[in-house]
Each structure stands twice: as C-alpha cells, then as structure tokens.
Amino acid sequence: MINDIKKDADARMKKSVEALNANFHKIRTGRAHPSLLDAVTVEYYGSEMPLNQVASVNVEDARTLAVVPWEKSMVPKVEKAIMTSDLGLNPAAAGNVIRVPLPPLTEETRRNYIKQARGEAENARVAVRNVRRDANGDLKSLLKEKEITEDEERHAIDEIQKLTDKYVTEIDKLLETKEHDLLQV
C-alpha cells in the first residue's frame, strides 16, 4: 500500500517535470531547434495535424530552420501555419523547401521569455506539491483505517517529502539552464 502510494507519487511528479521540459522546448532561445515548431498544427485533409507529421523539420544553420513538406501541395498550408502561429516567425518558401529564419531576440523578448519560463517552472512546482498533498492524504486515510501505524505513516511522509525535494530541485535546475540559454546573446 505505502509502496504503491510512493510509486504513484513518483510517477506523477516525474510527469510534471517531463511536461515542464516539453514546455521549455516551446520557448525559443536564440538558436534554431526543430522542436521549436512542435506546437504548430497544419490543416491536412480536413483535420489538424502536428507539423512534424506532415513535414520534416531540420536545422539549416544556427538561426534557420528548413521545413520540407512531404507533399508539394502542402507548402502553402505549412507556410501559413508557421506564419499564423504565435511564434513571431516569417517563413519563406523556395520551391518545396520552406526556410524559417529566426530573428535575433531583443532584450525585452528575452525578459518576457524568462518570465514565461519562470511561470511554467512555478506551475510545475505547484503540480509536484499537489502530488505530495494527495499522497499524504492517502497515507492519512490509511492511518485512519488502521491499515498502517503512525510510525509507518511518518516514515512514508518523510520519503514523499524527499521525492518532492528531489523533483523541485530538478525543476530549479531546468529553469536555471533555460534562463542561461535565453540570456546568451
């Protein structure tokens, strides 16, 4: 029972950190990275598809992405999808290749991205703490039902706290790395 609660808490906390990492990949730094366009969806035969399922996205150089749709007829739709995404990018089609130059980040944009990253990190910390609260509540209910002793409950709560501290530290490290990437010119 206690181990199940700990395993569940660990898995849920890990998912929170993975979600944060995915969100951080959507925040662009000054460098080109294929995952930058992961959030872009394209209308493909009547349904919205992620860009990486209708085209290949490659890094051409440090500030340019090359997007090659698998069907030539998709070039205008892919170009429009990138342009209308809220990433502030202006793609240019050349034949069946769409080049996406990344404008250099202004100081103000960097600050806004850092603020956004800090907000995402705080949301992840809150999610981890909510998992801790749920796990502690489950332990208290087991204690109330006399399925575990007070010592077992106290020990399990300490272990859940250690898990929480571990994942919050991991979140802080991810945030520090992202801030460092954003501040590099």
Swiss-Prot record:
Taxonomic lineage of the native organism: Bacteria, Pseudomonadati, Pseudomonadota, Gammaproteobacteria, Oceanospirillales
UniProt keyword Protein biosynthesis present: yes
Record-given protein name: Ribosome-recycling factor
Its job: Responsible for the release of ribosomes from messenger RNA at the termination of protein biosynthesis. May increase the efficiency of translation by recycling ribosomes from one round of translation to another.
Key words, A-Z: Cytoplasm, Protein biosynthesis
A GO term for molecular function: ribosomal large subunit binding
Subcellular location: Cytoplasm
SUPFAM superfamilies assigned to the protein according to its UniProt record, in alphabetical order: Ribosome recycling factor, RRF (SSF55194)
Taxonomic source organism: Chromohalobacter salexigens (strain ATCC BAA-138 / DSM 3043 / CIP 106854 / NCIMB 13768 / 1H11)
A GO biological-process term: cytoplasmic translational termination
Record carries keyword Cytoplasm: yes
Superkingdom as given in the UniProt entry: Bacteria
Family the UniProt entry places it in: Belongs to the RRF family.
CC annotations in GO: cytosol
Pfam family, one: RRF
Cystine residue pairs: none
